[in-house]
Swiss-Prot record:
It comes from Prochlorococcus marinus (strain MIT 9515). This is Elongation factor G. Belongs to the TRAFAC class translation factor GTPase superfamily. Classic translation factor GTPase family. EF-G/EF-2 subfamily. GO terms for biological process: ribosome disassembly. The gene is fusA. One of its GO terms (molecular function) is translation elongation factor activity. Residues 8-282 form the tr-type G domain.
């Protein structure tokens, strides 16, 4: 089957931004003007094509990265609309990994907002060329040039306007294209009647000034153009387009456009710019990978190269399990067998589809540069490489951030336990930032994710898609107990109930052990006061008592016990009697050894703009945190602290609120430390049922 579009005329792009900047509305207008949909769907009406999950339509936010194919000016454009909420950062991350170019949407009023910085950093991580659409120019307070300045200063990007708005706020009537040096005036509300006209007299001077600056900026990136510009003092439209494109591909220039997607102004010009300036698969560096012998290799964007693709998303839907793939090289055919080189497993390609949000079109093959989905894969998960068995390669995978919040989950009815397990397995296959584990001590199922909204929506999906009602609670903190002093303990177990009785007697010395030793047992019995066969059971009795502690039922750690004396009975002594005696001696001794409660301490690192440094440190201190270090570099502050795990629940939400969404943090286990007396008393009282 021949190609519908040559690779040079394919664009794989993402639309990404801060929440509420108008990404999904922009995508909807692109689909409308390019003929994919014949009626405009609005996000606030719950009718957007790319927002096809129930929760997306209810909440008016984009949760999953919806992939859509359309065409414009004889080019195939594959678009991914990504969420702007920080809880769904993996959707942006995996999109950036497989895209060739990005349209970053900014609000003309809000400008560079918190999530825009995060998205920009993600695009930087994968070196994705980009252009900017300053949206919502119809809103009160819209300021195109101010936003352009913010992008330059806060994102350190060489952003340059290639358009100017004619009017603003309620009077946005058209757009000046500085490249063609023409004005485009909108004559109807639907944005379909556009008049190409000369630049209005009152804006000629401003347009001339910005066009001259644009020519100069473009020429600086190209030796050939700088000579022409110095010789003739200007560049032609074609030369400007060539220079802008080169600047975008080399990451030396970010063209900035303007308009209002909601008011149907500027979107067709955005599509023109995608075709003119963003890269085709052949314009970006070939994908790198590792061969079975450990050597690095590349796969060029070429139908004739060995097949390779990256699975960047797995989704369960009513039609079955869909695996989204980015084709990097070769051809993938329906019915063929391929290798999952990441897992060293063979896979069969049952069906292939390209998507238009929740609609799909079956195809016989996918080719280099395509974004599509595969049905029938059993072992493939996000980040896996698919390739030919003859030419195996493992492609660079994607960065998967660690979850930052966790909660306990259980089904509302015991009969739903199996359904809950299946739901959790399916959801964790789809989303690599959603982790499921079982707490070995509490036996609770614990789910972890990127934020409270993330987990809330996953629990909601369990109900809608898997018909499982679940109770959600805070996870139990894994406290521990230990001792701070030494003492002796004695346990004597004697029972006589007719016939053979029970008798066991041990004397022990207890003391704190080295940190990390857990339970340490030493036998110092001499003279056979306790026969050898009873020493093991006595030790086991103590060890088992360790598992449930003496203060609040938590495991006792770092305790050294020395068996020093005891007695036995020739007839009545037994292993069980000595096991019970060992437990009694342990409980007797530990009460006299100043037992204390320990809590897990977490190593926390917080990164935020330095404006929020004081708030971040103050908040960590209020959580019983100990600040261990801080630094400020290029407007960004980093704080290192040790904070009790018990105080970190809800921190992701608090940090986001405190830093306007611009703070990020990482957290890992450090060590156990003693719980302050007042906190310990409350925990012990609660666990003993006195609360």
């Amino acid at each position: 089957m021949a190609r519908d579009f040559p690779l040079e005329r394919v664009r794989n792009i993402g639309i990404a931004a801060h929440i509420d900047a108008g990404k999904t509305t922009t995508t909807e207008r692109i689909l409308f003007y390019s003929g994919v949909v014949h009626k405009i769907g609005e996000v606030h009406d719950g009718a957007a094509v790319t927002d096809w999950m129930d929760q997306e339509r209810e909440r008016g936010i984009t949760i999953t990265a919806a992939a859509i194919s359309t065409s414009w000016q004889d080019h195939r454009i594959n678009i991914i609309d990504t969420p702007g909420h920080v809880d769904f950062t993996i959707e942006v991350e995996r999109s950036m990994r497989v895209l060739d170019g990005v349209i970053a949407v900014f609000c003309a009023v809000g400008g560079v907002q918190p999530q825009s910085e995060t998205v920009w950093r993600q695009a930087d991580r994968y070196s994705v060329p980009r252009m900017v659409f300053v949206n919502k120019m119809d809103r009160t307070g819209a300021d195109f040039l101010k936003v352009n300045k913010q992008i330059k200063e806060r994102l350190k990007a060489n952003a340059f306007p290639i358009q100017l708005p004619i009017g603003a706020e309620g009077d946005l009537t058209g757009i000046i294209d500085l490249v063609s040096n023409k004005a485009y005036l909108y004559k109807n509300d639907l944005g379909t009647d556009i008049e190409e006209a000369p630049i209005p007299d009152e804006m000629k001077d401003e347009a001339l000034e910005w066009r001259s600056k644009l020519m100069e900026s473009v020429a600086e990136n190209d030796e050939e153009l700088i000579e022409i510009f110095l010789d003739k003092g200007e560049l032609t439209e074609d030369q400007l387009k060539k220079g802008i494109r080169e600047g975008v591909l080399k990451h030396g220039l970010v063209p900035v456009l303007c308009g209002s997607a909601f008011k149907n102004k500027g979107v067709q010009l955005v599509l023109d710019a995608v075709v003119d300036y963003l890269p085709a698969p052949v314009d970006v560096k070939p994908i790198q990978g590792v061969l079975p012998n450990g050597k690095e290799d590349i796969r060029p964007s070429d139908d004739n190269a060995p097949f390779s693709a990256l699975a960047f998303k797995v989704m369960s839907d009513p039609y079955g399990k869909l695996t989204f793939v980015r084709m990097y090289s070769g051809v993938l055919s329906k019915g063929s067998y391929v290798m999952n080189s990441t897992k060293d497993a063979k896979e069969r390609i049952s069906r292939l589809v390209i998507l238009k949000a929740d609609e799909r079109e079956e195809v016989d093959e996918l080719r280099a540069g395509d974004l599509g989905a595969v049905l029938g894969l059993k072992n493939t998960t996000t980040g896996d490489t698919l390739c030919t068995t003859d030419d195996p390669i493992v492609l660079e995978t994607l960065f998967i951030p660690e979850p930052v919040i966790s909660v306990a989950v259980e089904p509302k009815t015991k009969g739903d336990m199996e359904k809950l397990s299946k739901a959790l397995q399916a959801l964790s296959e789809e989303d690599p930032t959603f982790r499921v584990s079982t707490d070995q001590e509490t036996n609770q199922t614990v789910i972890a994710g990127m934020g409270e909204l993330h987990l809330e929506i996953l629990v909601d999906r369990m109900l809608r898609e898997f018909k499982v009602e679940a109770n959600i609670g805070a996870p139990q903190v894994s406290y521990r107990e230990t001792i701070r002093s030494s003492s002796r303990g004695e346990g004597k177990y004697a029972r006589q109930t007719g016939g053979k009785g029970q008798y066991g007697h041990v004397v022990i010395e207890m003391e704190p052990a080295e940190v990390g030793k857990g339970f340490e047992f030493v036998n110092k019995i001499v003279g056979g006061t306790v026969p050898k066969e009873y020493i093991g059971p006595a030790s086991n009795g103590m060890k088992e008592t360790c598992e449930s502690g003496v203060l609040a039922g938590y495991p006792l750690i770092d305790v050294k016990v020395t068996l020093v004396d005891g007695s036995f009975h020739d007839v009545d002594s037994s292993e069980m009697a000595f096991k019970i005696a060992g437990s009694m001696a342990f409980k007797d001794g530990v009460k006299k050894c100043n037992p204390v409660l320990l809590e897990p301490m977490m190593k926390v690192e917080v990164e935020s703009p330095d404006d929020f440094l004081g708030s971040v440190i103050g908040d960590l201190s209020s959580r019983r945190g100990q600040v261990e270090g801080q630094s400020v570099d290029d407007g960004l502050s980093k704080v290192q602290a040790k904070v009790p795990l018990a105080e970190m629940f809800g921190y992701a939400t608090q940090l986001r609120s405190m830093t306007q969404g611009r703070g990020i943090f990482s957290m890992e286990f450090a060590n156990y430390e003693e719980v302050p007396r007042n906190v310990a008393e409350a925990i012990i009282s609660k666990n003993q049922g006195n609360s």
